[in-house]
Amino acid sequence: MAVPPPAGSEPVIARPGVGQPALRPATSGDVSRLAGLLADAFINDPVYTWLLPGSLRLQPRLRAMFAAEMEQYVLPNRGTVWTTFGCDGAVAELPPGAWEMPKSFTGKEAFRWVRAFGMRSPLAMRVQRAMEERHLREPHFYVRTIGVRTARQGRGVGSALMQPTLQRADSAGLPTYIEASSERSAALYERLGFVHMGVLELPEGGPPVWPMLRPPAGSTHRAADG
């Protein structure tokens, strides 16, 4: 997550393409608002609704989890969170070598994680471990989370949010890795050049998750079906 620019300097702005929203790197002051929009974006996500079945407090639980991820995982690991100027969507990326979640985040001191998942925290931690075991090992950029406010979905915001990460990966000649938790998100990632790497079966009969990889532009890199 970026530090605000010094007074008098121009902010960093990404303009993905004609007709697409301009983006900016989020600051620590955006965390609460971005956690709220991500909670809204993932309110019907198959993985989260399975992890927290029938929860009447699903949205505040998700908000707490996303805030914790940004402040305890993405930010300390040299990550960047891109958002639109209206905070309609957000994407959290991690650079090569920084994708592993700190042990302190899922260990005994992870109070905010426990607050978010409650009695389901042990299962949530098993899901995280399963994803880490399957994670791409070669150097890559990792898109940890991407979400668009429900009222703004289907308008190209998600595609625009992905552009800074994909451009950085292409410049570095490295692939980009992401996990799709729904067929709809997998279809979006396919349109952006990602290919499937098999299916990840979650513990205790959880819904499928699709690891996906996008080779750098001009590369002959092919994803293995895992």
Where are these regions (language model features)?
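A short beta-loop-alpha structural element at the N-terminal edge
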Residues: 22-36, 40
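Active-site rim helix/loop that mediates acceptor-substrate recognition in acyltransferases
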Residues: 55-79
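Conserved beta-hairpin
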Residues: 71, 75-93, 149
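Conserved acyl-donor/pantetheine-binding loop and adjacent beta-alpha core of acyl/acetyltransferases
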Residues: 87-147, 153, 203-204
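Conserved GNAT acetyl-CoA-binding A-motif
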Residues: 139-141, 168-181
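Conserved acetyl-CoA-binding loop-helix of GNAT-fold acetyltransferases
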Residues: 154-167, 191
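Conserved active-site alpha-helix within GNAT-family acetyltransferase domains
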Residues: 159, 171-172, 182-199, 205
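C-terminal "cap" of GNAT-fold acetyltransferases
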Residues: 174, 178-183, 202-226
